[in-house]
Amino acid sequence: MIKNMKKSRILILSIIGIIVISLGILSWNKPDKKAGEDVTKYDYVASFYSIHQNGKMNPQTKIVFASSDQEQLEFSDKVYTAGRLFQEGNTVLAYSFSGNKSLLFESTSGYSTFSMAEGVFESTIYTVKLALNGTNGRIEVINIDDGSVGEIRDMIRYTSPDHKVTTSPVIHSSIYRAVEIGTRIYFVGYDMVQDQYELSYLDEETNELHYVDNWHYTSVNFEEFLYVDGKIVTVENPYNSRFMKNITLPETASLTSMDPDTLESKSVSLDTKRIISAYAYNDHIRLVTVDNHLLEYTVDLELVSDKVLSGTDFANLFTNTDYKFHGIRYLGNRAAAIVTPNTETTTELGKILEFDADTLTLQKSITIPLSENTGWKTDFVDLLIIEK
């Protein structure tokens, strides 16, 4: 009986040993998953790209996640030059310059890299200038550099209604604003050959380009391009085209509202020479003028209010000589500006200035410190308000 007990004990210990060894082997073969929190815990993400530090060529990218409570997380990379930011669900992308690998942030633990699909374009030198979330997937505006001189070549890559990733025909315009409405992608861009700004749309069902000629005999620069309460809204500043010297052109800014289906439009001239910022708020259009007024219009172009901004922190964004203003982002009731020091510095990358989108009063100033003691001057910066 004692012998049987010993045999049973040995058998049990052997089984336990085999289980432990097996678990050890399984654990060794299984790669560790990086632990980390969701990047959407932060309120903002900013990218900073510098070609020189301390006066020497040393390209570097910095991606900084920041919250209104001053919590920050920084990533630096000297191999991949990336900057244009885009949010897709719970991930953040930093698109590369000139065909390098782009950066993908899925958690606070780090980032991975990815490349555009090979063989899609004639050239491997390309830059994603603009990205937006479409109905069927990501929409990307891509600039192609094939060595052509004096010619702009852009393309739009999107997912068609039949769920195929599609690349548009070549567009000889530098696209800088776009919006998807139904199965059309409307966009504005600059035609260098014609020296004019244009509004066009891409039909996703046929992959055909269509030019909207409302501005063919005018000379305007589209400061902003919005989709508000079912209408396309273009905010226009005067532009002196070299081909329109003998044509009398308006000297003030204007606002146009257009039906996206019929392309019927109406415009109103504004009592200001230039609009410096514009955004949608509660189905209205907000316009910030160069002479420090905040104008609010309906999509039917009726003036709702006119507020003076002179002397406010928001107005000072455009006149501050210590910092360079790089733009404003709007999302819901938040407006955020990004500024960087005008000269090389060893203390900070820049500041995120958080405003109330309704009143444009300053809520928070978030300083992003420079993490190493080196002379830094920003050559490119982008800011994204993270959507929760």
Model-derived regions, located:
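Acidic, serine/threonine- and glycine-rich low-complexity intrinsically disordered segments
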Residues: 160-323
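A detector of repeated loop/turn-to-beta-strand junctions in beta-rich toroidal repeat architectures
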Residues: 136, 196, 250-252, 347-351
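Short beta-strand elements that form the blades of beta-propeller/WD-repeat-like
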Residues: 38-58, 79-97, 102-103, 120-143, ...
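Repeated scaffold domains used in trafficking and secretory/extracellular systems
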Residues: 33-34, 72-90, 111-131, 165-182, ...
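Hydrophobic/aromatic beta-strand positions that recur at structurally equivalent sites within the blades
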Residues: 66, 95, 105-107, 142-144, ...
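Short coil turn/linker residues within repeat-based beta-strand modules
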Residues: 69-70, 99-101, 109, 146-148, ...
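Hydrophilic extracytoplasmic domains
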Residues: 21-29, 33-36, 40, 94, ...
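N-terminal "mature head" segments of proteins
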Residues: 2-135, 157, 375-379, 387-388
